[in-house]
């Protein structure tokens, strides 16, 4: 699925200063390698971006993965006019090898928030490739698997709230039990939960529990029939095409404020034999066991 724009790719490195993490641990500086996909200006052969300000999506990959696995999905968003910044989590990305640890997941919401800060700083600069590119009032976050746990904490846990975020897509994620705050003690921003019903890694109860715990009016659950943990987000297949269309319509609705995009969500999310989209707490989405 391709949008109107051709896309560019630029790799950046941000250094998150030393700070106290949400559990009170002292954290040293964290290096955040970041791949930024962005819409290119029409009529130019170089790397010049389309005219801003544009909406921003910050994306968190799953444990021991990097954004390359999700390239088609991220490119779909960028080709539709979004700047998409995908972080390499410093202690759990594909680059960490045997040193990767899920214990650092509690610190990853801070990495996502620092990505937002860093991208906005580049946009505020007077010069540079991304100067003036990003609209600070149009920011979404998304993540898959452990990256989904990460963005779910920003949206719904008292530990990690970031009020700059307008919408959150949790792709086969869960409530990470070691987060220091409380989940869903307040109404979060609009959230979309996507889940394969044949997923044995992040089992359906993990996403269903969040959908049911969320009390916001704008909440959605995309049920993918027979999909496993990664197929809906990697490469191009019938599941990935549904996820690409529904997530894009979700961002268009709640980041850009385009009301007709909700109809597009329902049209693209209800595909006989492939997917069903439920909303506002409705649908046969049963809470269940979640093992993380």
Map each language-model feature to its residues.
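Residue in the alpha/beta-hydrolase core beta-strand immediately N-terminal to the catalytic nucleophile
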Residues: 128, 138-140, 167-169
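Conserved hydrolase catalytic core segment
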Residues: 154-165
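Alpha/beta-hydrolase-fold serine-hydrolase catalytic core, especially in secreted/extracellular enzymes
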Residues: 226, 235-292
